[in-house]
Amino acid sequence: MLGSTGSIGTQTLQIAEEFPEQFRVVALTAGQNLDLLVQQIQRHQPELVALANADLLPELQQRLDALGTDRKRPQLVGGPDGLNIAASWESADLVVTGIVGCAGLLPTLAAVRAGKDLALANKETLIAAGPVVLPELKKSGSRLLPADSEHSAIFQCLQGTPWAENARLSTGVPTPGLRRIQLTASGGAFRDWKAEDLENATVADATSHPNWSMGRKITVDSASLMNKGLEVIEAHYLFGLDYDHIEIVIHPQSIIHSMIELADSSVLAQLGWPDMKLPILYCLSWPSRLETPWRRLDLTEVGQLSFRAPDPAKYPCMQLAYAAGRAGGTMPAVMNAANEEAVAQFLEEKIHFLDIPVVIEAACERHKADLIAHPQLEDVLAVDQWARMAVREQVKRGTTRVPLAALAA
């Protein structure tokens, strides 16, 4: 479990506890939440624990020593190399990647190169490094199983088609018979706000999601619809469709998690309550399904399902993501890194919510002349660092916000 103390990690470990006959946790990685990590170590008794911050290893060792149990202690490793060791741990059959942002890229690649199957909750890995990751998947035979709700929904819908064998998510080639993907979006924290009212948006407003329980960064991405834009790029890499055939639909109830249209014009959808444990469980149990006592969907309780097209004037980040995806090469990596840095600056209240698309667009514009069409890993890592620095520099200079209508034009 990469990122065991985060939102995806804690929910994955809850599932492992619910199904002890099916799943055993062999390795955990975490950032710096030692309190929760120690509890997880006690509960799951992994063989290996990796800390992203190697400086915290002595403190973790002391805390484990203080427990004074007779149980076998896990091996402790730290830093980037430690994360890679955990990601390629020999006794692991499946690696769940829940590390937020581009920090998850190198451990994910380590897992792929070790031939591990992956439950991918870290969408930034494919977005920033799709041209690097997909050939590695083909080489190693690893399978990529999407752990976020939308791509899991698409994957599940494809299981009911004659092309299920092609939907292995390991090549990025077009899925035969798949005509269109419709990614559903809740609309995020500002779905019922008027575009002009976003001038008054605060960090507290942007981090209050109406439907899903998620981490702060992804909740802000949901509010800007950048999250859905990133998912468009991810869907392009996973299922091989071009951007003209991947659409975003606002669906406030978050009951339909995504839809696919097939060659005969029929549409398949996957439904369920908005609960991340459902797609995570499917990744862990695929191709089987495990019986759960979880709350069952009652459509009469839901009452109605509604849909509308997203307003480009209100969600400029969505347009930026489509543009970066179509540009290809290193542009998605630049856009993703610029967004990560912009959101971090917003959460620290150094910029306004409406500055987020402005600084992202500026970084993407600056990168156009230097775009690398067929990047190597080193190129992706280099432009990632460059884009973060470009955003920080712009924030220091001060942002010049432009009207929303101008951004959408």
Curated annotation (Swiss-Prot):
Natural source organism: Parasynechococcus marenigrum (strain WH8102)
Family per similarity comment: Belongs to the DXR family.
Disulfide partners: none
Binding residues annotated for 1-deoxy-D-xylulose 5-phosphate, in chain numbering: K123, S149, E150, S186, H209, S222, N227, K228, E231
This protein's name: 1-deoxy-D-xylulose 5-phosphate reductoisomerase
Reactions performed catalytically: 2-C-methyl-D-erythritol 4-phosphate + NADP(+) = 1-deoxy-D-xylulose 5-phosphate + NADPH + H(+)
Taxonomic lineage: Bacteria, Bacillati, Cyanobacteriota, Cyanophyceae, Synechococcales
EC annotation from Swiss-Prot or TrEMBL: 1.1.1.267
Binding site for Mn(2+): D148, E150, E231
GO molecular function: 1-deoxy-D-xylulose-5-phosphate reductoisomerase activity; manganese ion binding; NADPH binding
Binding locations of NADPH: T5, G6, S7, I8, G31, N33, N122, E124, G215
Keywords from the UniProt entry: Isoprene biosynthesis, Manganese, Metal-binding, NADP, Oxidoreductase
